[in-house]
A protein has these predicted regions:
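HhH-family (HhH-GPD) DNA N-glycosylase catalytic core used in base-excision repair
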Residues: 1-182
């Protein structure tokens, strides 16, 4: 069942969330910095609602140098302390350190095609199948493989569920068609 604007009911009625779902979510997105930002935001979302992260997105961008992996990779303990005291973002030490670790891993991937190419290599031609309640799956064989591959390449805090969320968010998985949002 859809809400106003033909969005799935689970989107809710928050205007920011509805705009995000209409204009960004599931639309094809490429580029190292774009994919790195989305990976980091999905990492921060673990255990929280996406709306919480969405409302803090601009603060995250400011705090993490617009998610420029070259800059984030230079972050040290003083930066971690600064981030831990920034009430505008999610202040989780493990997640903040994971973003810095993942920035280093992103830089290391440049000689192997880059983060964008690795994530997009897991695109599937298989259509997304909704469950009996019209809900998306929480992971896929491709997201399991992507999480494993990224962990082997030095990434942390990347599991099958948040990698599936990343894949959906940037259009690697064609969720818009499955939900009738094309």
């Amino acid at each position: 069942m859809a809400n106003e604007g033909n969005l799935p009911q689970w989107v809710g009625n928050d205007p920011m969330m509805m705009e995000y779902m209409r204009d960004e979510w599931g639309r094809i997105a490429h580029g190292e910095q774009v994919v790195f930002e989305r990976l980091c935001l999905e990492l921060f979302q673990s255990g929280l609602s996406w709306l919480t992260i969405l409302k803090k997105r601009e603060a995250f961008r400011g705090a993490f140098a617009m998610f420029d992996p070259d800059v984030v990779a230079t972050f040290g303990e003083a930066d971690v302390d600064r981030l831990m005291s920034d009430a505008r973002i999610v202040r989780n030490h493990r997640k903040i350190n994971a973003v810095i670790t993942n920035a280093h891993a992103t830089l290391a991937l440049r000689d192997a095609g880059g983060l964008d190419a690795i994530v997009w290599a897991y695109a599937s031609e298989q259509p997304v199948e909704l469950d009996g309640n019209g809900m998306l799956p929480t992971q896929s064989p491709e997201s399991v493989a992507l999480a494993r591959d990224l962990k082997l390449k030095g990434f942390t805090f990347v599991g099958p569920t948040n990698m599936y969320a990343l894949m959906c968010a940037i259009g690697v998985v064609n969720v818009r068609e499955a939900l009738g949002l094309v």
